[in-house]
């Protein structure tokens, strides 16, 4: 009998703006999707195509997030763990085992879980979760870019690039920015002095 195994991964821990996303995916026993690997190794076009195929073929999948406010109140690590728990609890089927990318497991999952370092390159369920989390995170950045094109979110995806830091200085901090992240926090402190 096939054991329902979920893979879990996150996207968006490092950026200065937006939510941190996590996805949980349960795949069928015979699942095979050529080219599926760690989302960071895939082009955006390939990720988007794979995401659609994963959603169509998965036994269950769920994407969840923790907001910038939750990141500020919990810290990025705990907010990531919360997003992972939400992703697991949002699955339409209950997995019997969970593999989580990285070296930490959210507390009180209630399901046997194992952390796998570089799991997004080793375990297909984690690879699938990696793709879904990354495409959801990118979608949030594209939506923000539509509302605030001057920041260039569609290009740098919220990371602390030169373009993003210059836009922060020129246009200011948005409600979506992570106020507890050093570049944003430092800019707010400088502005408070003047």
Curated annotation (Swiss-Prot):
Chief location bin: cytoplasm
Biological processes, Gene Ontology terms: DNA replication, removal of RNA primer; mismatch repair
Enzyme class: hydrolase
Listed GO MF terms: manganese ion binding; RNA binding; RNA-DNA hybrid ribonuclease activity
Pfam families: RNase_HII
EC number from the UniProt entry: 3.1.26.4
PROSITE patterns in the record: RNASE_H_2
Bound cofactor: record note: Manganese or magnesium. Binds 1 divalent metal ion per monomer in the absence of substrate. May bind a second metal ion after substrate binding.
Disulfide bonds: none
Keywords of the record: Cytoplasm, Endonuclease, Hydrolase, Manganese, Metal-binding, Nuclease
List of residues binding a divalent metal cation: 9-10, 101
Location within or outside the cell: Cytoplasm
Residue stretches making up the RNase H type-2 domain: 3-193
Catalytic activity: Endonucleolytic cleavage to 5'-phosphomonoester
Cofactor: Mn(2+); Mg(2+)
GO annotation, cellular component aspect: cytoplasm; ribonuclease H2 complex
Cited InterPro entries: RNase_HII, RNase_HII/HIII, RNase_HII/HIII_dom, RNaseH-like_sf, RNaseH_sf
Function (record text): Endonuclease that specifically degrades the RNA of RNA-DNA hybrids.
Protein family: Belongs to the RNase HII family.
Protein name, UniProt field: Ribonuclease HII
């Amino acid at each position: 009998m096939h054991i329902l195994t979920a893979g879990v991964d996150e996207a968006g821990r490092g950026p200065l703006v937006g939510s941190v996303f996590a996805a949980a995916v349960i795949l069928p026993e015979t699942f095979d999707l050529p080219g599926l690997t760690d989302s960071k190794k895939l082009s955006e076009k390939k990720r988007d195509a794979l995401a659609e195929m994963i959603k169509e073929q998965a036994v269950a999948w769920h994407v969840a997030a923790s907001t910038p406010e939750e990141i500020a109140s919990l810290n990025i690590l705990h907010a990531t763990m919360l997003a992972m728990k939400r992703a697991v609890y949002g699955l339409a089927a209950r997995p019997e085992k969970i593999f989580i990318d990285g070296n930490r497991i959210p507390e009180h999952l209630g399901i046997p879980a194992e952390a796998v370092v570089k799991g997004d390159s080793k375990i297909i369920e984690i690879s699938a979760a990696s793709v879904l989390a990354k495409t959801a995170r990118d979608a949030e950045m594209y939506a923000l870019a539509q509302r605030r094109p001057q920041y260039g979110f569609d290009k740098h995806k919220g990371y602390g690039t030169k373009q993003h830091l210059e836009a922060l200085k020129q246009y200011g901090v948005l409600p979506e920015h992570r106020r507890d992240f050093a570049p944003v926090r430092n800019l707010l402190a400088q502005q408070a002095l003047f």
